[in-house]
Amino acid sequence: MTENPLGYEKIPKLLKNFAVPSIVASLVGSIYNIVDQIFIGQGVGYLGNAATNVAYPFSTICLAIALLVGIGSASRVSLCLGRKEPKAAAKAAGNGIVLMGIFGIIYLLVGETFLSLLLKAFGATTDVFPYAKQYASITLIGMPFLIVTNGMSNLIRADGKPKYSMVCMVVGAIINTILDPIFIFVCDWGIAGGAWATVIGQIFSFILALRYLWRFQTIHFEKESFLLDIKESLKICSMGISSSSNQIAVTVIQIIQYNSLTYYGALTKYGTDIPLAACGIVMKTNAIILAIVVGISQGTQPIIGFNYGARQYHRVREAYMLAIKWNLVVSTIAFIAFQFFPQSIISLFGDGDELYFEFAVLFMRTYLFMVLVNGVQLLSSSFFTAIGKSLKGALLALTRQTFFLIPLTLLLPLRFGIMGVLLAGPVADFSAFILSVVLVGIELKKQKNATHILSLIHISEPTRRRGIS
């Protein structure tokens, strides 16, 4: 078995090779929803945008499942390879793939069975509900394929092939983008056309991802690798829980936000549907930035995991700090775009009246005001997951959404009305940033001390041997 370049290649080169394809692959996941939103907004109107927004929690739950198994199994694989345990790595990967399939089928069945109930819980109004039901009933068909594809992409990156992972996602996005205008406008299928275009794109990505099973280089599968092991499954889920819990929290906050916006919006001149549609556009625009941060995080994960397992702590620190610098560049560009060009961005998603644009611009500028720092929490959570400290990673993943954003979204509107929903975002972002800096700072200091101790051991070994001889 050849030596893994994760252990010796220069960190900037590794991060470029791993993060850039991961960013592209992660962006594709957001583009699936963005492309639908743009074409549906142009073809159906703002009620169509509101409908895709109401159905969006199905996608975030799907991603949570994919991250639970995908990040969990990939983290296990990276640690096992770093410790030179190839059989354990194969077992982790095999069990992860089986879990992806099982969870995907269960999710489809549960979603279709309770579709109407879930859409109402997600905040669908009377006017939006029929559009949302038509869209969600179709897109749920593609969820099992999406779970396997997203989960496999993490394993493919852990195997040292981030470009192939990127190709899998890009092919599906291209097909989706081509089919969207054909199905929506040419075939006149409306919102259903956008849904079918998404599903077909996901199936093509799934086929490409599954083909990689016979191409793994650092992992050598045997039949036993795919036998579901409860202990191994629990280890996988425990290591993926931090990334997954963050997505689950995103889903919860989406539901709370949608219901808060419709409730407090009804008390204002904006009504119920305008805040719902505007929220969807702002969130999905921000999802592009978050996708880049997630891509950087996923690209950094195998580098950090492998070198932590190999006790090369100086490389762990270097990888994390470089990822933070990349994030700062992206966040600065995003801040400028959101604060100075909000109406231009919102106009991409279709037309609306003056009230619609007034609220959407206000929403974007206020809610995304602290975009400069909100990526640090995601990178830090992934950092702890990569080094095997899944509990701390899960705790950090939950800070922004669960500990800060949910209570603020419930409490601030009591004093500030619908404006309180918007203000909750930047306050939660800044609070999570402070906590992330403190926790990661403590961990990096521990690793620095461990590096010093290891260097002393290496120095003393030759001296002791000379003394014996």
Feature names for model-found ranges:
Residues M1-A19, V77-G142, V186-I241, I304-M370, ...:
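Short alpha-helical transmembrane segments in multi-pass integral membrane proteins
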Residues P12-I31, F58-I65, I141, V167, ...:
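Residue-level signal for short hydrophobic patches within transmembrane helices
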Residues N17-D36, I138, T149, G172, ...:
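Transmembrane helical elements of multi-pass membrane transporters/channels
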Residues I31-A50, L119-T126, I182-W189, T251-V282, ...:
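Helix-terminus/linker motif at the lipid-water interface of multi-pass membrane proteins
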Residues D36, S73, F114-L115, M152, ...:
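Hydrophobic/aromatic residues in alpha-helical transmembrane segments
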Residues N49-L109, L146-S165, Y258, A278-P342, ...:
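Small-residue-rich hydrophobic transmembrane alpha-helices
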Residues I61-A64, N176-T177, F206-L210, I288, ...:
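Hydrophobic transmembrane alpha-helices of multi-pass small-molecule transporters
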Residues G70, T139-R157, S165-A173, G194-I207, ...:
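Short runs within selected transmembrane alpha-helices of multi-pass transporters and secretion channels
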